[in-house]
Structure formats: C-alpha cells, structure tokens
Amino acid sequence: MVSLSSHPARALRGEIAVPGDKSISHRSIMLGSIARGVTTVSGFLRGEDNIATLDAFRAMGVQVHDDGETLRIEGKGLHGLTEAEDVIDCGNSGTSIRLLTGLMAAQRFYTVLTGDRYLRRRPMRRVVEPLSRMGACIHGRDNGEKAPLAIVGRPLTGIAYDSPVASAQVKSALMLAGLYADGATRVTEPHLSRDHSERMFRHFGARLETDAAGVTVYGGHELDGRDIVVPGDISSAAFFLVAALIVPGSELLIRGVGVNPTRTGILDILAAMGGSVELLDQREVSGEPVADLLVRSSALKGIEIGGDVVPRAIDEFPVICVAAALAEGTTVIRDARELRVKETDRIAAMAANLRAAGATITETADGMIIEGTGRLNGVTVESFGDHRIAMSMLVAGLAASGAITVSDTECIATSFPTFTALLDKVAVR
C-alpha cells in the first residue's frame, strides 16, 4: 500500500485545469458505442473508473481509437454490441456497473458484471428491482443486492418508476434500458439528481422529455454519433476550491470547470460558509455549462446543510467535512444517508479521520455534526480504499498544524490520477 503525506502550506497560488468530468466521460463512451457512426471525445478522463467502462465496450466489439488527446469511437448502433467472451470487470466503478446493468438488460446476449472487493459490497438492488419490473432477467448475490450480476438480455417494456433515492446512477440505468424498451420509460425522484444523462441523450438525438419531477425516454429510436468536449470535473475542482479557501493567502484560478446546476451544490455550500469563489467566462460546451473558477482564501463559518442541495453535492461531502472542521462554529449535515453506501461509508470514514486529527464530530443516521474549531493536527489516517476520502484528508494536511499521512492512496487513480502533481504545482511551502 502506498502512503502519501501532505504538509502545511503557506498558500496556494497559480492556475490549473482539472481532468475531464468523470460522469460525462462514462456517458460519452456508453452513448458513443451504441450510436450510429463516429463519436469523438476530447477531454476524456483517463482514470481507472472510466477505463473500466472503455474496456467493457471494447470487450463487446466496439472499436475505440485513442491518440492520447481524443477518443474516436466507431459506434455499433442500438443493436450492434456483441457478447463479451469473459466476465466484465468494472473495478471500483459504481457508475460502470449500475449503468451497464441497465444497458445489458436489453441486449440479445448474456453478460456477467463484477468489480473489486469494495464494489462487490455496494447495493445493486436499487437498479435490479426496477429493471426487473421492465422484464429484465438479472441474478446476483444476496437476491440481486450484490455483484457479481448475471444478466440474460431480453425484450423490455417501459414503466413509470418513482425512485426512493435521488440517484443519477439509478435514473441513468433505467434511461439506458428505456432506449430499447417498448413504449415510454419514466423516472421520477424525491430530489432531481445530476442531469448529464438527459443532456447527453439529447445531444445524441434520443427522444426524451424532462420536467420538474423527472424524465421520460421513448424507446426504439437510434442515436447518431456526435463530437463531445468533456469539461473539467467540478468534483475534482472541489478539492482545490476547499484547499485554497482554508489556507490563508491563497488565490487560485481553475479553468474550464463544468458548472452544471445539478452539480454546483458545492459552490452554494461554500458560498454559504463565507467562501469567495467567482465564476468567470461562463459558456456552454457540448450542451454543458462551463466556467473558470477564481477562489480566494476566506474565513469560513459553520452552517446547516440539507434538503435539495445534498444530491447536488453528494460526491463533495468528504472535502466539505474538511472545510467544516476548519470553519468557526457548528456545521450540521443531514439528508445525506446516501453517503453511507458510497465506495465506503463516507460518514463513518470522515468522522473517524477528522476525529483522529482533533475535530469534534457526532455521527447521525443521515449525516454528522461538526464542531468547527479552525484547527486540525497532524496524524496518520486511512483512505478506506476511497479516492475521495484520501484526497480530502490530503487537503486537510495543507491547513493542519503538522503533516497528515494517508495510507492506501492508490485509489486516487480511480478519478484523479494527476491530483498530487497538481497539488505540488500550486502549493507554496
């Protein structure tokens, strides 16, 4: 296991561009593969999760050419995928396995999906159950709750599904299945999750309708290849936003970040805490809003976080916890039970790590209470095999009284292979 240490910084200064958005990168491969004609993708995130998706489609007969800058996908059309000769390994990627489950349920062949030991613990019935209502034949451990999943493709029928959780993965799995289903497939949620799938479906020419409650996909219509430019991932930018806010004297410009409104909960939360983050040169790229983010160090204060903002910031909560621990006053996080079924239980993991660094934290069933003191101590902590836990604690080390060492950091390559190099570039020590 590789351990990394983060030492106190005097400031963060300069300009960076974070890698391409992980969610959009996944979807570009999936839709490009089942579209007719050629799709090009620039800005693709070459993290382990996205490579797992890429390898899955190559295993199903899709030709993907990579010159190091741009992917060229030779789409096979809705019914052109072929059966993989082996089990498809999704690694640590929940997005890969859940979205592929929806897509594979409608194919004319047999598929087995698995993943690493962390992914095999994560809940899958949330996609298996509604897909089964559509007519899918899916078998898995623990009555379909856990991977590996064995999927026998068969004709599907559209349904109206009211999801009990606001999950873009659940919604997107059903949308992908809905492309093949007889009739309309409608998905509603308690709070609207990120809408990258809806935007990209439109970009590829799918027939769908959206409203305030959800999305409806009409099956049986072919997609056409498109050119896609993937913006920088706001979930990756979040580590640098918080780092610059908590280290006095910092000023950092992050260029070309996706600012889709369903993903900008992190910006709203940091602004409510008193953080200075400006959106510059706002524009649209491949159907997605993009901006440059200028962040300056700020005195943060504790706030209450809950409700609709939670699904808009669900992946950023580990680093939000770091900001809260270094703020003045109490931060209450609620309505975030989904954090307990991520790559690890992120509520328990961040509570344990920040307590080890001297923070006062009380766990609740759906969140935590953080008593901000503006101070953390140097310590050695665990990543729990979770890339966002690892990076969040390395950010904490920039503003701690001593070095914070994180063990088992190979997981960072899941989403942000260049994280430490960018951190070294802008940290003034």
Swiss-Prot record:
InterPro entries associated with the record: Enolpyruvate_Tfrase_dom, Enolpyruvate_Tfrase_sf, EPSP_synthase, EPSP_synthase_CS, RNA3'P_cycl/enolpyr_Trfase_a/b
Top-level taxon of the source organism: Bacteria
The protein's enzyme class: transferase
Enzyme Commission (EC) number: 2.5.1.19
Sequence positions that bind 3-phosphoshikimate: 22-23, 27, 167, 169, 315, 342
Pfam families noted in UniProt: EPSP_synthase
MF annotations from Gene Ontology: 3-phosphoshikimate 1-carboxyvinyltransferase activity
Pathway(s) the chain acts in: Metabolic intermediate biosynthesis; chorismate biosynthesis; chorismate from D-erythrose 4-phosphate and phosphoenolpyruvate: step 6/7
Binding annotation for phosphoenolpyruvate: 22, 94, 122, 169, 346, 388
Compartments in which it is found: Cytoplasm
Any one GO cellular component localisation term in the record: cytoplasm
Catalysed conversion reaction: 3-phosphoshikimate + phosphoenolpyruvate = 5-O-(1-carboxyvinyl)-3-phosphoshikimate + phosphate
Role noted for this protein: Catalyzes the transfer of the enolpyruvyl moiety of phosphoenolpyruvate (PEP) to the 5-hydroxyl of shikimate-3-phosphate (S3P) to produce enolpyruvyl shikimate-3-phosphate and inorganic phosphate.
Similarity remark: Belongs to the EPSP synthase family.
Complexes and interactors: Monomer.
The name this protein goes by in its record: 3-phosphoshikimate 1-carboxyvinyltransferase
Taxonomy of the source species: Bacteria, Pseudomonadati, Thermodesulfobacteriota, Desulfuromonadia, Geobacterales
